[in-house]
A protein has these predicted regions:
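Alpha-helical interface subdomain recognition
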Residues: 1-3, 8, 16-21, 32, ...
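Short beta-strand-to-turn element immediately C-terminal to the catalytic PLP-Schiff-base lysine
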Residues: 15-17, 58, 85-89, 106-108, ...
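A short, Trp-centered hydrophobic/proline-enriched beta-strand micro-motif
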Residues: 32-41, 86
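Short Gly/Pro-enriched turn/cap motifs at secondary-structure boundaries
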Residues: 45-48, 73-76, 95-96, 122-129
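Beta-sandwich/jelly-roll carbohydrate-recognition scaffolds of carbohydrate-active enzymes
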Residues: 52-56, 72
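A short core secondary-structure module
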Residues: 64, 68-116
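Flexible, small-/acidic-enriched active-site or ligand-binding loops
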Residues: 111-139
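Long, acidic (Asp/Glu-rich), low-complexity accessory segments flanking structured domains
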Residues: 137-154
Length: 305
């Protein structure tokens, strides 16, 4: 998780930060001296309806910003030195389009902890460090505004596309693990005097999971190609995430079914990975929202939400 987080959060700064910001922060992030792991976007009342977020950054007399609000499902905040934060800087009722009036900040969490920043861990069913984050009159220097004030939604989208591509890559890796684990067990486990992998009822789910994993992997590569070339890759990033998440969970189901009762035993690791890969049916974007995006923005259908 830490590796992919560093890549997609850093992309927002890399693509939209000023020369001064890049010179100050990027070398230390690249060397590992500073950890940029936290991406503060989701809120308890907004979820994927990002433009309805309530965290507000107000300018003070010196032109610096004072932030109040709350984020949730902010992964790795406990282990991060810096945070990419999306906050509203113009009230929603004062903008023409709801995507306007949102700004992105780089928060130095080392300075902010105990000075308006509070982090509360959330326990989950899997090995994933995630938190609630509270901002109470937290100050952010004006030089930590990334890009132009009010244009942050556009900046954050590029980070979200990178996140979806990276999560998709992880899901492909998970699917490969499940398929390899299931195949090895099916060849080794003998029942009624022969390997269970000799039965088509065992073979077919694993083989189908493999085919779907390979198809998802190709979409991940296409999304990556377009992202690296600076092309519009929203549809491809979303499709890669959806297909890879589905392939991973399909492979997880096949793997746990192949192992039978042993699939639920901790020593085989299957149940742990099964719980972990279930997350990606929901995060960082749900399958239904991806389908709505494709229907509207690719197929030209009316907006459904």
């Amino acid at each position: 998780g830490g590796c992919h987080a560093q890549m997609y959060t850093m992309g927002t700064l890399l693509r939209h930060g000023s020369d001064e910001q890049k010179a100050k922060w990027l070398p230390k992030i690249a060397s590992g001296e500073l950890r940029l792991q936290a991406f503060g976007v989701t809120e308890p009342t907004s979820g994927t309806d990002t433009t309805s977020l309530k965290t507000f950054a107000k300018k003070d007399a010196n032109g610096d910003y004072v932030v109040n609000g709350q984020k949730i499902w902010t992964s790795r905040a406990e282990y991060s030195d810096l945070m990419i934060l999306l906050a509203r800087t113009t009230p929603k009722d004062q903008v023409t389009k709801k995507t306007e009036g949102l700004s992105v900040f780089l928060v130095d969490m080392r300075e902010a902890r105990g000075h308006g920043l509070e982090i509360r861990p959330i326990r989950t069913m899997m090995n994933h460090a995630t938190t609630e984050v509270f901002f109470t009159d937290m100050k952010v220097p004006k030089e930590n505004l990334i890009g132009e004030e009010g244009k942050g939604f556009r900046y954050i989208l590029s980070g979200m596309n990178a996140e979806r591509i990276l999560i998709a890559s992880e899901c492909v890796g998970d699917a490969k693990w499940f398929i390899a684990k299931a195949s090895a067990y099916a060849k080794d486990r003998a029942v009624f005097g022969r390997p269970i992998g000799q039965n088509q009822g065992i073979q077919f789910p694993i083989a189908k999971a493999y085919a779907n994993m390979r198809a998802a992997e190709l979409m991940v590569k296409e999304a990556t190609r377009k992202y690296e070339a600076g092309m519009d890759c929203g549809a491809e990033a979303n499709m890669a995430k959806m297909l890879a998440a589905d392939a991973s969970f399909e492979a997880a189901n096949a793997c746990i079914q192949t192992h039978g009762g042993f699939g639920f035993a901790e020593e085989y690791d299957v149940e742990r990975k099964f719980r972990e890969t279930r997350l990606y049916q929901v995060a960082p974007i749900s399958t239904n929202l991806i389908l709505s995006h494709l229907a509207e923005h690719v197929l030209g259908m009316p907006r459904s939400y």
